[in-house]
Design a protein with these regions (language model features):
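Short beta-strand elements
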Residues: 45-54, 320, 423-430
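Peripheral, non-AAA+ core regions of ATP-driven protein-machinery
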Residues: 2-9, 14-18, 22-256, 260, ...
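Conserved alpha-helical scaffold flanking the Walker A/P-loop in AAA+ ATPase domains
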Residues: 318-339
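Basic, amphipathic alpha-helical bundle interface domains used for macromolecular binding and assembly
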Residues: 67-75, 90, 97-107, 326-327, ...
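Inter-Walker segment of RecA-like/P-loop motor cores
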Residues: 302-311, 318-319
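Walker B catalytic acidic pair
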Residues: 343-344
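Walker A/P-loop
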Residues: 257-296
Length: 552
């Protein structure tokens, strides 16, 4: 064995050559290597570093860095997978460190970077190339690279560091393409990852193109046709409800529908996405990153349509807001930039409904958990549908068999503060049967002013007016205007002020209620192409503000 002489504690000692790596100030040689990786902490993505040190000593495999069980279990997965590619772990002391050490590492995305950094320390791949490489992916026992969640969100964070290349699972390649013009390579196996790292720059570029073409060809046949919302023209009658839906879509207002069973409340809600304005590219990236972190991004493609989330009435508080020590996105976050539809709203538990009050007001949800405090986006439009009583036919006493106390208890699940945040309330009554026999041809649907095509055009025009009004500032829908912005963008004349004062005294409106009436009136004026809010606009807003529709 090669030995060297070193002064230790004033004494001359003959030491094995490889012990030099254990003393401060000496070079570690090729037994140390580092690679970049990505992780998720709730919805927040971050760039991590994976370091490995292989030194002489009793054979062991230590992993440090505040790791969750999913990351620690990678030890056995990697032991078997590396053996499958004839790169078994050396019978030495292996220490893997994950930084930053102050963040809990969870998920299986650290498998691939850990495997690559061990291979580099063994000399299987060039260690210097890993310093500019970013990698995530789960490694199976057969050395295949499997899909992980949150790749799109992690790529957004990694893009700020401008790495030379990005290595992800082939199944996540759609998210890599959606992240922008990044040099992203999708690999199917650990051997393919090694081949990519060992290749030249020109060869790597060719491999990236081939992987993208292969992914496009595989997903092209499986692409589903775009799901279209039902057309509003298919709804018979319901002019007031259609008007309320158009106002809600134009200004991002909350809407409550009440009426007997079978009157079309749910059908109207399903039609609403068909008249909503399209998302901007920034909103598509934002919403897609949320769904990627939740593991619900289909085919890794950017979400094109606004989310429409409809939880079951048995959903718990944690399902609505997000559950877990590091909470996953709940229903309110999945509905971000879209619609949260609560069918049979009075069947939800009251505490489940009351947690909606904060995100309805602020557009985000604050969660306090054992591992920290989290703030998730939750800017949605709430759409509720409910029956007026347990049987659904109140106040028709010919059909309703509910006692007064039963009706009161049933409606009491909708608290006053929650109802005060509903901008629009609309009662839907039974439609006469003769409406069903009216002619419904395709040409009629296209030309009908109550059809989705015409309504969508009106909504887009109203949104353009809002955008022009907020020119030079961040675009905000009328339903999201702050009190200061209401004074700036929604001025009232003397006649309108007197009208609103009298109406608010008669209806007992709160200050928040008055603000919401002004917001709705501003949207109605935008739909009619008016620059100023008139008395007629305030009157229509007050008509839809009537919250006694549940008891009429």
């Amino acid at each position: 064995m090669v030995k060297t002489v070193m002064i230790v504690g004033g004494q001359r000692k003959n030491l094995p050559f490889f012990w030099l790596a254990e003393f401060p100030g000496t070079e570690r040689g090729k037994m140390y290597c580092q690679i970049n990786a990505g992780g998720l902490y709730g919805l927040q993505s971050y760039v991590a570093q994976v370091e490995v040190d292989i030194s002489k000593g009793l054979p062991c495999f230590d992993m440090v860095g505040l790791l969750d069980s999913e990351v620690r279990e990678a030890r056995e997965r990697l032991r078997v997978s590396l053996h499958h590619i004839n790169a078994a772990l050396p019978a030495e002391k292996i220490t893997v460190n994950y930084s930053p050490a102050g963040i809990v590492k969870s998920g299986t995305s650290f498998d691939l970077p850990t495997a690559l950094v061990i291979l580099a320390a063994q000399g299987k791949v060039p260690p210097e190339r890993l310093k500019e490489l970013w990698a995530v992916g789960e490694v199976g026992l057969d050395a295949r690279i499997k899909q992980v969640r949150g790749v799109l969100a992690m790529l957004h964070a990694a893009n700020q560091s401008a790495f030379r290349s990005y290595l992800i699972p082939f199944e996540n390649l759609g998210e890599g393409i959606a992240a922008g013009k990044l040099p992203v390579m999708g690999v199917c196996s650990l051997e393919e990852a090694m081949e990519y790292v060992n290749a030249s720059a020109q060869e790597q570029e060719r491999m990236r193109r081939d992987a993208e073409d292969r992914w496009q060809s595989q997903t092209k046949g499986g692409m589903e046709k775009e799901k279209k919302a039902p057309d509003f023209a298919l709804l018979c009658g319901m002019e007031e409800a259609k008007r309320a839906a158009m106002i809600a879509a134009a200004g991002a207002h909350n809407l409550l529908l009440a009426g007997p069973p079978g009157t079309g409340k749910t059908m109207l809600a399903r039609c609403l996405p068909g008249i909503l304005p399209p998302m901007s590219e920034e909103e598509k990236q934002e919403v897609s990153a949320i769904y990627s972190a939740a593991g619900q991004l289909e085919d890794g493609r950017l979400i094109q349509e606004r989310p429409f989330v409809s939880p079951h009435h048995t959903a718990s508080v944690y399902a609505m807001t997000g559950g877990g020590a590091v909470p996953k996105p709940g229903m309110v976050t999945l509905a971000h930039r879209g619609v949260l539809f609560l069918d049979e709203m009075t069947e939800f538990k009251r505490q489940t409904l009351d947690v909606l009050r904060q995100p309805m007001e602020e557009g985000k949800i604050f969660l306090a958990r054992s591992r920290g405090n989290f703030v998730y986006p939750a800017d949605f439009m709430l759409l509720g549908a409910t029956n007026p009583c347990p049987c659904g036919y109140y106040p028709d006493r010919n059909r309703c068999r509910c006692q007064d106390w039963e009706v009161h208890r049933y409606l009491a699940r909708l608290s006053g503060p929650l109802l005060d945040r509903m901008d629009l309330c609309c009662q839907i009554k039974q439609t006469p049967i003769r409406k069903l026999w009216e002619k419904r041809e395709a040409s009629y649907i296209d030309s009908d002013k109550n059809g989705s095509k015409w309504m969508r055009e009106q909504v887009l025009e109203a949104r353009k007016r809002q955008q022009m009004r907020c020119r030079g500032a961040a675009m905000r829908e009328n339903g999201r205007l702050s009190p200061g912005e209401i004074l700036k963008y929604c001025p009232l004349g003397l006649e309108e002020q007197e009208f609103l004062e009298q109406a608010s005294e008669q209806a007992g409106l709160s200050m928040r209620g008055c603000h919401r009436v002004i917001r709705v009136a501003r949207t109605i004026a935008d739909l009619e192409g008016k620059d100023r809010i008139g008395v007629e606009h305030l009157g229509q807003a007050l008509f839809f503000r009537n919250q006694n529709v549940l008891r009429e």
